[in-house]
Design a protein with these regions (language model features):
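Short, solvent-exposed loop/turn positions at domain surfaces
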Residues: 44, 390, 553-555
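Surface-exposed, low-complexity/disordered segments
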Residues: 32-36, 47-51, 72, 108-113, ...
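Bacterial Sec-dependent N-terminal signal peptides
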Residues: 1-27
């Protein structure tokens, strides 16, 4: 927001309106932006084309939609791989880290060749249905995007056809005039000009009086919205123009220092931006790719995506050529800028997004009675993650609802939920809210398939002299779990039998094993812990199989010892992690994976599930097509080392933003 406040202060000196009205307008715009901050995403990948079974390495730039600074508010970004039928092939969830949002998507084996798209979004971005962020990739070949005027009639705003708003872009400014037809009775109009909601002009305009905006007074670049308003500030007409993108760019230079060639045949390369302001730094991603595979013509880039695609409704992706040619004017005809309804904002009608910003992961659900399905108030809900040594408890509200916040665990983490009444009874029904992800229903960017490609892209780099190319070898290993204290349950247990203990004892049944535990007795097939008495008499210990409680009359002989990996006994204070049902002690049996069918023990108060956790970044493996991939570089300049052979056949691509929101983009063959 630093850049936004700075720009607004500058605009105060260039807005041709009385100071009092000007201050009101600026305060309303600023209030809307603060009340409903919007975001944009851009996906930078390690290549433009892939093969089935290959891994897509990516970084998502999440920026403020107004000033393009990376200090955005969402904690998570979702990335989906969509096939040509708009169906989700893979979905990952990225957590903000020191490197930004860095992750990968594995392309399944056997997928058909064609154009696929990477869709990226935050929960906050779902408030805008007509603004999507797509990145085209090609599997099994190469292709290029073609410019398109996407057609979508949703939410089109009607304007007065009796007034023509004419916008003429000049070298040193912009001339705005109106052509009013004879049947129009209105004579008093206002012209409102903004770029990404940043107001640039607000003043009177008439058929006899044109408005001239000088180049130096315009601080922004990208899509400008020229709105003609009547005396009640209702929008009469609107025109969009793509102008002065150079105002948003931060040019960089790449210089080779041949005189510093190192002994290992590597040459230093210095990347810097001479136009950086005081305190301004770059946050960029870098890749080096083989120049003979993908032609950069017909590909999108960060400039066209942030300045054009994400500011035009129903425009998911255009090639980078839209920023360089005369195409934007035809593509913007009859379009409206609708990230904010600016005609309402200048009236003081500011709105907030319906979907809140996702700042932490949450698990939600509901607890109700088995009969009548009535909500249970003050019910106890336990959340346990055996894999991550995690345990937390909460209570339900008057509607039987519960929620756990701050559940930040990686993908694949398994959870167990147990619900009970306030009195500790398990005769309840536990309902878990399923995660919902929006389907993509918009248009796919048009493209032209240029060539097929079956070349192995996971081949190694150029072999050194005397090297031997080996076939791919996969090595798998399995280490048996002999530890008796390997997860959250066993570490707090009073007594444990691990796999090694069970094998050394040679027990033939669980009863034989439990008789070795002090203060535990086995009578008539039930286990009792000494001291386990209630006002209703003596009660047996609870039995949990793989974290799920079974009925009190469950026969432990149903479990074969060959299927058991560990047995843990909880007595006294250690039973607190199991909730009220574990008050008489708990016998926890962990089976070998896949050998025990827990589904044969249906429990309405227990759920075992896995959520879409965040993805852990993986190291990049260089290949012949992309020998270098650096997802995150921050600073005012960078010094990289490249092998000398890169200078003849490889291309360097750098994209990112600066701390002040200026866009960084560089593409060029190394050494030229």
């Amino acid at each position: 927001m630093r850049k936004l406040l700075f720009v607004i202060l500058l605009i105060c000196f260039h807005t041709s309106l009385y100071a009092q009205t000007n201050n009101v307008l600026l305060s309303r715009v600023l209030r809307q932006v603060q009340l409903y901050p919007q975001e944009k995403t851009y996906v930078f990948t390690d290549a433009e084309s892939y093969q089935a079974g290959q891994r897509i390495h990516l970084r998502v730039f999440l920026v403020n939609a107004v000033v393009h600074q990376v200090d955005s508010i969402s904690r998570y970004v979702y990335v989906e791989l969509l096939n040509p039928e708009r169906l989700v092939v893979k979905r990952v969830r990225l957590l903000r880290s020191d490197q930004g949002f860095v992750g990968h998507i594995d392309i399944p084996e056997g997928v058909v060749k064609g154009r696929y798209v990477l869709r990226s979004y935050t929960k906050n971005m779902l408030n805008l249905s007509r603004y999507e962020s797509l990145k085209s990739i090609f599997i099994g070949g190469h292709g290029r995007l073609t410019p398109s005027k996407y057609s979508n009639s949703l939410n089109r705003e009607e304007t007065n056809n009796s007034i023509n708003l004419l916008v003429n872009v000049l070298k040193k400014g912009i001339k705005v005039s109106i052509d009013k037809l004879s049947n129009s009775s209105e004579d008093d109009y206002r012209l409102f000009v903004h770029c990404r909601s940043i107001p640039l002009y607000f003043g009177k305009i008439s058929k006899e009086k044109d408005v001239i905006l000088s180049y130096d007074s315009l601080s922004q670049g990208g899509i400008y919205s020229f709105q003609l308003l009547d005396t009640k500030l209702n929008k009469v007409a609107e025109r969009l123009k793509f102008v002065y993108p150079e105002k948003e760019l931060c040019p960089i230079s790449v210089r080779w220092t041949d005189g510093e060639k190192l002994n290992n045949n590597q040459i230093p390369c210095v990347i810097k931006a001479d136009s950086l302001r005081e305190g301004e730094t770059m946050d960029v991603s870098v890749r080096v790719e083989y120049a003979g595979v993908d032609n950069t013509v017909g590909q999108s880039d960060i400039i066209s995506h942030l300045l054009f695609d994400m500011d035009k409704a129903d425009c998911p992706e255009e090639p980078s050529s839209v920023c360089l040619e005369s195409e934007p004017d035809s593509l913007l005809d009859n379009c409206n800028w609708s990230r904010y309804r600016m005609s309402d904002v200048i009236k003081g009608e500011c709105k907030k997004g319906l979907i809140g910003v996702e700042k932490s992961a949450m698990i939600r659900g509901r607890v109700e009675t088995l009969i009548g399905h009535k909500p249970i108030k003050d019910g106890v809900v336990n959340l346990i993650s055996p894999d991550k040594s995690f345990y937390v408890v909460t209570k339900t509200d008057a509607q039987g609802r519960f929620s756990f916040e701050g559940i930040d665990f990686p993908e694949g983490t398994q959870y167990v939920l147990n619900a009970f009444t306030k009195a500790g009874k398990s005769w309840v029904k536990l309902l878990l809210d399923e995660d919902e992800y929006p389907s993509y229903k918009g248009q796919l960017p048009p493209f032209v398939w240029t060539s097929n490609d079956t070349t192995r892209v996971d081949a190694t780099l150029k072999l050194p002299k005397g090297g031997i190319q080996m076939e791919e070898v996969n090595v798998f290993s399995h280490q048996p779990t002999y530890s008796s204290r390997s997860d959250a349950y066993s570490r707090t247990a009073d007594f444990s039998f691990g796999l090694r203990d069970i094998e050394s004892i040679g027990a033939t049944c669980l009863h034989e094993l439990l008789r070795r535990v002090p203060s535990v007795t086995v009578e008539f097939g039930k286990c009792y812990v000494r001291g386990g008495f209630t006002v209703g008499g003596r009660r047996p210990a609870a039995i949990a199989i793989d974290g799920i409680f079974v009925n009190e009359d469950y026969d432990l002989d149903n479990i074969q010892m060959a299927d058991v990996e560990r047995v843990d006994v909880f007595k006294g204070g250690s039973t607190v992690i199991w909730g009220a049902i574990g008050g008489m002690g708990v016998i926890s049996v962990t089976t070998k994976k896949g050998d025990f069918k827990a589904a044969s023990v249906p429990l309405t108060n227990t759920k075992t599930f896995t959520t879409l956790g965040y993805q852990i970044p993986q190291a990049y493996t260089p290949n012949a097509r992309t020998p270098m991939w650096l997802p995150s570089l921050r600073g005012a300049s960078f010094r990289l080392l490249f092998p000398a052979e890169y200078r003849s056949t490889y291309r360097l691509i750098i994209e990112g933003v600066t701390s002040e929101g200026r866009i960084v983009h560089y593409t060029g063959e190394i050494g030229r």
